[in-house]
Every structure is written in C-alpha cells, then in structure tokens.
C-alpha cells in the first residue's frame, strides 16, 4: 500500500466521522438525533425530529463526506482496490465516528456519495432504484436495502474492477439495517411520509410508547 492510498483511507475515515446530523441539530437547536426519534443520527431521523430543511442539509453533507475523499483518491490515481477501501473507510467513519463516541448512522447517504465518483450512469441508476422503491413502498429503509443488494450488479456491469469493494460496502449497509429488516418483516417499520405527520401530531403518550417499542427492539 502506498503512502497516498493509506493517507486517503485515513482521511476518508476522519471525514466520515464528522456527524452532520448531530452538528446540524446543534446549530438549529434541535434535539440530539442519537437520543430522539429512532436514535439514528441520519437524514431520515432528522426529518422526523427537525423537518425537511434540516434533513436535506444533513443528506447533502453526508453524501459529500463520502464523495470528496473517493474523488480525491480517484484523481490521485489510487488503484481500484484502495479506492474501494477509501469508500469503505468513509462509511465506517459515519457508522463509528471517532469524534462522537463511535455512535453513528447507517451509512447509506455516505455510501451513495462514495460510489458516485465511479460514474454518473451508476449514480443515476442507484438514485432511480432508491426513489422507485420508496415511491412504491413508502419505506426509506427498504429503498436503502434494495439499492445495497443491487449495487454490486450495477457496478459489475459498468465498472467490474470495483465490484468487490462495492459488494463489501453493500454488506456493511445491510448489516446496519438488520433492525429495519426485522421491523419490515413484522410490519412495524414507519413510512417516510408518516414521519412529518407524526412530528406534527405526536402526543407525549405516543412518544413514550415509541420509546418503549424502540427499547423492545
């Protein structure tokens, strides 16, 4: 491994460790996403507790912190294997952030940003897959799961040299969605457009019930 490749992997992990959900909520004086809603510091949970603007800001920053290190590594002609490890490092930083006691999100937006530099055709397919799944089902988590399952096949078709690293990345995303898969199977997963409705209508009793359900999970 060259010094440049090692440096990019470390840089990617540190970029991923910047929890935009926590920082945006602090700036906007919103509740800590690690302690409210689903407890996941990501854009979907910020949508629940803070609304669309805060969620969109988190989403953009989460995508960029995956995209930036991989793009720089790509421009520095890092080999495909280490380029893939750079992408994985960014996602690991998001999931286990060194700056936030290793309690992070699920890495979907960061993984999407990390895959984007491979090609815009692939990016378009991934976006379309996620959007179509969410529009048909209403479940953001299902969109992420389906996209993670299909991503290695898309990459194999367009850029086969990146198939193995992207497959590893997909496995990481699927592992982080273990609880969501169980809730989907039991029919207890909440739909994405229900989140704003719940934010407006939720009573203290409902919040207590949601917290109890979360503890049972």
UniProtKB/Swiss-Prot annotation:
SMART domains: G3P_acyltransf
UniProt protein name: Glycerol-3-phosphate acyltransferase
The reaction(s) this protein catalyses: an acyl phosphate + sn-glycerol 3-phosphate = a 1-acyl-sn-glycero-3-phosphate + phosphate
Cross-referenced Pfam families: G3P_acyltransf
Listed pathway(s): Lipid metabolism; phospholipid metabolism
This protein's encoding gene: plsY
Species classification: Bacteria, Pseudomonadati, Pseudomonadota, Gammaproteobacteria, Enterobacterales
Taxonomic source organism: Yersinia enterocolitica serotype O:8 / biotype 1B (strain NCTC 13174 / 8081)
Keyword Transmembrane helix found: yes
GO MF, one example: acyl-phosphate glycerol-3-phosphate acyltransferase activity
């Amino acid at each position: 491994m060259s010094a440049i490749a090692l440096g990019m992997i470390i840089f990617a992990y540190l970029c991923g460790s910047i929890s935009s959900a926590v920082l945006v909520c602090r700036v906007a004086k919103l509740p800590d996403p690690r302690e409210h809603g689903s407890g996941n510091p990501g854009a979907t949970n910020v949508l629940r507790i803070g609304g669309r603007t805060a969620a969109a800001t988190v989403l953009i920053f989460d995508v960029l912190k995956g995209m930036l290190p991989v793009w720089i590594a790509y421009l520095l002609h890092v080999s495909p294997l280490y380029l893939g490890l750079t992408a994985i490092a960014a996602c690991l930083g998001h999931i286990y952030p060194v700056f936030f006691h290793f309690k992070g999100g699920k890495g979907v937006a960061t993984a999407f940003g990390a895959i984007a530099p491979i090609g815009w055709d692939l990016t378009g397919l991934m976006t379309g897959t996620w959007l179509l799944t969410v529009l048909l089902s209403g479940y953001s988590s299902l969109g992420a799961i389906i996209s993670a399952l299909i991503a290695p096949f898309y990459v194999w078709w367009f850029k086969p040299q990146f198939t193995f690293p992207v497959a590893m990345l997909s496995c990481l995303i699927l592992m982080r969605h273990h609880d969501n898969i169980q809730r989907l199977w039991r029919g207890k997963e909440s739909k994405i457009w229900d989140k704003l409705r719940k934010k407006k209508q939720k009573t203290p009793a409902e919040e207590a019930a949601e917290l109890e359900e979360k503890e049972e999970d």
